[in-house]
Amino acid sequence: MMKSDGNCQFRALADQLYQNSDCHELVRQEIVKQNMSLSTNSQWGDEVTLRVAADVYQVKIILITSIKLIPFMEFLPKSQKEPDKVIHMSYLAGIHFNSIYKKNKEKGSRSSSSSSSAVWMKLQRKKENEAKKKEEEEKERKDMEKEEKKKDKEDKKKDKEDKKKAKVQKEKKEKKEKKNRNHHFHYSE
């Protein structure tokens, strides 16, 4: 039974494709490449996402529904050839997807657990790379802030020096003018 967390369709697809419903984020990411509106986790999947999933993974998806008028639906990839893999899912009461298997076939026998482990490792590496990238971006942002503060400090220092120079020049000018006035006054006596 898939968790009812808004990711049930992607969990069911991950379970069918990789025998690991925890790979639902990877499945979502692959489908999102085709349909950007689904990038938010817990955004419900629908018929469109099943069509995209059939295309992305080149599989036939058979969806058993609880709808009397439509007991099942098939989703095929756009390619003309018949897909090698068929996956089965259920859609209950119009609100929840599950991964289902034929009774005589055990879940683990569908493929080796090593492929599931490889997918899990790929997902973990991707998460680690994203975290590392985020960390690098944060460091770069902090370095830029530090550089801006340093530049601001230098600019303030330069402004202070410029004001000091302007004050000295003004004082010199005033002194010179005063001297000229005194000198002029001296001659008029």
Curated annotation (Swiss-Prot):
Residues 105-189 are annotated as: Disordered. It is an enzyme of class 3 (hydrolase). It is found in: Nucleus. GO terms for molecular function: cysteine-type deubiquitinase activity. The active site is at 5, 8 (nucleophile), 96. Its EC number is 3.4.19.12. GO terms for cellular component: nucleus. Gene3D superfamilies: 3.90.70.80. SUPFAM superfamilies: Cysteine proteinases. Transmembrane segments: none annotated. The keyword Hydrolase applies. Its main location: nucleus. Keywords: Coiled coil, Hydrolase, Nucleus, Ubl conjugation pathway. Residues 175-189 have a biased composition (Basic residues). Residues 120-181 form a coiled coil. The keyword Nucleus applies. A motif (Nuclear localization signal 2) lies at residues 163-170. Residues 1-103 form the OTU domain. It catalyses: Thiol-dependent hydrolysis of ester, thioester, amide, peptide and isopeptide bonds formed by the C-terminal Gly of ubiquitin (a 76-residue protein attached to proteins as an intracellular targeting signal). A motif (Nuclear localization signal 1) lies at residues 125-132. Residues 126-174 have a biased composition (Basic and acidic residues). Hydrolase that can remove conjugated ubiquitin from proteins in vitro and may therefore play an important regulatory role at the level of protein turnover by preventing degradation. Belongs to the peptidase C85 family. This is Putative OVARIAN TUMOR DOMAIN-containing deubiquitinating enzyme 8. It comes from Arabidopsis thaliana (Mouse-ear cress). The gene is OTU8.
